[in-house]
Regions:
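Oxyanion-binding and handling regions
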Residues: 1-24, 31-39, 82-177
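A short glycine/serine-rich beta->alpha loop
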Residues: 27-32, 61-65
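Phosphate/pyrophosphate-binding loops at sites that engage ATP/ADP/AMP, CoA/4′-phosphopantetheine
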Residues: 44-56
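Short glycine-rich phosphate-binding loop at a beta-alpha junction
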Residues: 53-62, 136-142
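DPxDG-like acidic metal-binding loop motif
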Residues: 56-87
């Protein structure tokens, strides 16, 4: 089996965990939409203090706010490169665990919008997408990605690029319309 350092910064919560052979060794989080940069390093250090060395990194690839995603993905890639281990990307919405047959998960997209996806029996059937909450049918569940679920999904998916569903707020002058 494997030992995974798990990182997700797709929501206002920075999530870091250490999972060995499908057992959570350590997990922690920090709430703060503008503090991912500090939080991910502190949480990763705490995870590594458990004394178990990861042989791969599993990272949530969004959807999520541009800056938050970049922080987590960049940290994951740099950590993996320094240790010469693989990085596996996961759609963060897929890692939100819900005990229902049909449901919609959503996370705050700011600007009064949500990133959302619909699921049936744990399989994504629609999305991810970004809309106003009133434009999304169904009961919306607002939770956070689960560390163990991110690792479980790493056996069946590998998202190579961040899931950005809209342009960032800040763009280079040359790229402005």
């Amino acid at each position: 089996m494997s030992t995974s350092l798990v990182i997700d910064t797709s929501t206002s919560r920075t999530i870091v965990g250490l999972v060995k052979d499908e057992q959570v060794i350590w997990q922690g989080f920090h709430d703060g939409a503008t503090d991912h940069g500090n939080a991910v390093a502190i949480l990763a250090k705490q995870a590594l203090a458990a004394g178990v060395n990861p042989d791969r990194v599993v990272v949530g690839m969004g959807p999520g706010p541009f800056t938050g995603l970049r922080v987590g993905i960049s940290f994951a890639r740099a950590f993996a490169a320094a240790r010469n281990i693989e990085v596996i990307g996961i759609c963060s919405l897929d890692a939100i665990v819900v005990d229902q047959s049909s449901y919609t998960v959503a996370i705050d997209a700011r600007r009064k919008e949500i990133y959302w996806a619909k699921y049936h029996d744990g399989v994504r059937v629609e999305g991810p997408a970004v809309n106003f909450p009133a434009d999304v049918d169904g009961y919306i569940i607002d939770l956070y990605p689960d560390v163990l679920r991110l690792v479980q999904l790493s056996h069946s998916q590998n998202v190579s690029e961040p899931v950005y569903l809209r342009r960032p707020d800040a763009v280079a002058t040359a790229d402005r319309p």
